[in-house]
Amino acid sequence: GKDAAIFEGDNIQTSERSFVIITFVDGTKITIRPNSNFTVSQFSNEDGKKTAKLALHKGGIRASSGDIADSSPDDFQITTPTTTIKAQQADYSVRVCEGAQCQQEDDKLKKGAITPAHDVIARVVEIKGDVSAVSGEDLSQESRPLSLGAPLYSTDVLKSDVNGFAVIVFKDKGRITLQEDASFAISEYRLNETGKQDKAFFKLIEGGMRVLTGTIGKENNDDYEVDTLVATIGIRGTGFDLVQQSTGLSSKVWLGTIAQTNEAGTTEISAVTSNHIKDKFSKPTPIKDDDNAFATAAPRPDLVKVPNEPELFKTMPLDLSKPGTYVDVHDGHVRVQGSDGIYLDLGKNESSYTNEAGMSVRLEAPPKFMAQDPYPLPSEGFSENLAELGAYSLLNEDYALTASGQVFQCECAQ
């Protein structure tokens, strides 16, 4: 019943008319859907030994990650018959579909295709040390630590520590390396949005960044710019380094041309040329290409090899006729690894399918049976919408809803 303890090794099975929400001691929360089979294979919340291995054999779950996954995603995993799932600061859903089960469920739901989401605009392809991001729409929220494959979004503000850097690839094939002890903002980024002009606007807040431009800005230079404290940088098909210090802005062009605009006018410099601008009222003065301002261990982004780069944002149409594992991410970063050993990274509003052979693909849009799931994300708790969607009729008294509508929960021990 309510508040019952669950232990390492326990197996939980739900019937056709039941579901349960579980809370683990590290803060992980999982909703186990009807007709599911779930095992707590391994769980430890002890310092130095934190690890969790959970298994979904059948059915589905909806999960919100806790401290173990958030601090070390590799130490928290959920396996299905074909997939291993690791999450970081994420809300996500997992379904194991057998035969035509999910196709039949999908057919019963409201007609109409789910609109594909375009939230993820870049991914981390190389990282060292501590690098974090926070949405510029709410700088008061907790920053999220970035890891290899982490998704990035328009308005994100990134920051690296003194020993950290990150190389980022954007959907238009542009790249940026955020150097050590630096910060920059993705002020606005749009690509292939119906009725809107493509745009890539960035802001260097402090420290250094190394930039390789992509397709945005090639046809219209005004579609791409980097704002700094002392000048706005426009591009002409370009690779360049910028370093913002208390003494001003140092710029080095190693490919193409940039235009520097401030109160003193506009100056164009081409590869291979470097200069320094003291403040927004000053014209640039030449400096050596090996000036100390450009010293960094962070690589030029064009020199970083990215395995399977065409797959970073590639999506496939949905085909529900075959069995396999579906993952739908509502927030955060989830990494899916099929039994073929290949990773697939998912961000907010992205979903994937892994077939019985263990091959994973990113989907153009989530299936309706996941997007319209009436069972609650555990981070949201029980919702009255559950009753409106008919879920009351699915619940068994063994997992009783009280008159106030609270769902049975477990505090899960080690």
Indicate where each model-derived feature is located.
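Hydrophobic lipid-interacting interfaces of membrane-associated proteins
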Residues: 61-63, 209-214, 258-259, 334-337
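C-terminal interaction modules
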Residues: 1-3, 7-8, 15-33, 45-53, ...
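Signal-peptide-cleaved, periplasmic/extracellular N-terminal interaction regions immediately downstream
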Residues: 40-41, 63-64
